[in-house]
């Protein structure tokens, strides 16, 4: 609650979940780059994308359905089969501040407790055309800034792994036979 108001928060069931290890990998990679760092926001977005591409995805629906124990086991599995190799590829070694955190089970346990405590604030939806039709206006949360779009290479490597403009909202609507009529 904020100011006595509890907003309605919806999430597409299949939305990707960023894990604490995604965040730690991102921060560790930035630290390993030294003066050549990319200037990341530190939220692990690119690491989430990379993990999903590698076949270790995690959806909002899964996180909601699983018990704390099941989620913790899945995160441990990802750590054992993906995170260690990814950390090595990013140059995160024992001298890196984040190396130890990437092996600390308490970090995962705390993440799981926080995620499970807060995921209930979301209403999971299959945002199809019928469901969307109940709303007069849709608000799409977007990326970090137009100049950081993954396809705008003028500032490479200082980009995000996403499209930050109207591309994703327009694509989302198009898949449902809807159009983007106004953008503010």
Tell where the protein language model's regions lie, with residue ranges.
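Non-transmembrane, aqueous-exposed alpha-helical and coiled segments at domain scale
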Residues: 1-184
